[in-house]
Amino acid sequence: MHNSIECLRPNAVATHAKVALFDFDGTVSLIRAGWVEVMVPMMVEILHDLKSGETEDQIREVVLDYVGHLTGRQTIYQMIALCDEIQKRGGTPKDPLFYKHLYLDLLMEKIKDRIAGLRDGSIAPETYHVPGTVPLLEGLKARGFKMYLASGTDDKFVKDEAQLLKLDHYFDGGIYGALDDYKSFSKAILIKKLIENAGVRGDEFLGFGDGYVEIENVKQVGGVAVGVATDEPECQIVDEWKRKRLAGVGADYIIPNFLQHQDLFKLLFPE
């Protein structure tokens, strides 16, 4: 530990890095904090209604496992997994998009006051920042990083919410979210395009995320990855469930928030 920074690979330095890739929800934004508590009960209820003989707790374990495994990918993949589980229990699933819209309706009900408050100015943007986000982004900008935001949340929502949080201008590389044609975009595809079209080398990537996917994608190309194991919404301690998954896919560092960004920079960019 380095204050609240857990260093899993002491020699992981980002001295060659030029590109920073960020996830959105749970990494820099807390607008959707609590989404797991919306998605999981919805799925548990749907599966429990199939009367497979499992207890609610047994079903919850199954749901938590695949929801966690797919965090960071487009939301539709979690709904495809739900459809698979419905079939396994002898049910006939509807289209995954049906379940995605059902989930988004429930989530919007939970977060509508947050969005409205940010939009009318009654809530300050930093209320829904992961602590230390702005100083971290400012520090990376000062180091000449080109920054990209890539999220599993729908494209129109990510762009709107990044703007409401007044974070959009930091991401000069662009803001990318999920598309209806979900196979046409992923974080891995974005990284591949940057390598092929922008001439970015794998070791020039620095990734930040609270989900399995972006950490794995950055590590696969040889970049350095910081696992942001936010215990939402306070984000003062490490969420052990997130930590285990992030460490499991090769995160170099684990942090609960960005408040120790200067210490993190000393580790990433030793002089």
Regions found by a protein language model. Give the residues of each.
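A metal-dependent, Asp-based hydrolase signature
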Residues: 65-142, 146
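Active-site neighborhood of HAD-like aspartate-dependent phosphohydrolases
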Residues: 2-61
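Acidic, Mg2+-coordinating phosphoryl-transfer loop and its flanking beta/alpha structural elements
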Residues: 151, 207-253
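Substrate-recognition element of Asp-dependent hydrolases with the DxDx(T/V) motif
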Residues: 27, 39, 122-129, 133-163, ...
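Glycine-rich phosphate-binding loop signature in dinucleotide/nucleotide-binding domains
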Residues: 142-145, 197-203, 268
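Conserved Lys-Pro-Asp/Glu-containing loop-to-beta segment of HAD-superfamily phosphomonoesterases
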Residues: 185-218
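A short, structured active-site edge motif that brings together acidic residues
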Residues: 97-98, 168-184
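Short acidic-hydrophobic, aromatic-tinged amphipathic segments that line or gate anion-handling sites
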Residues: 176, 252-260
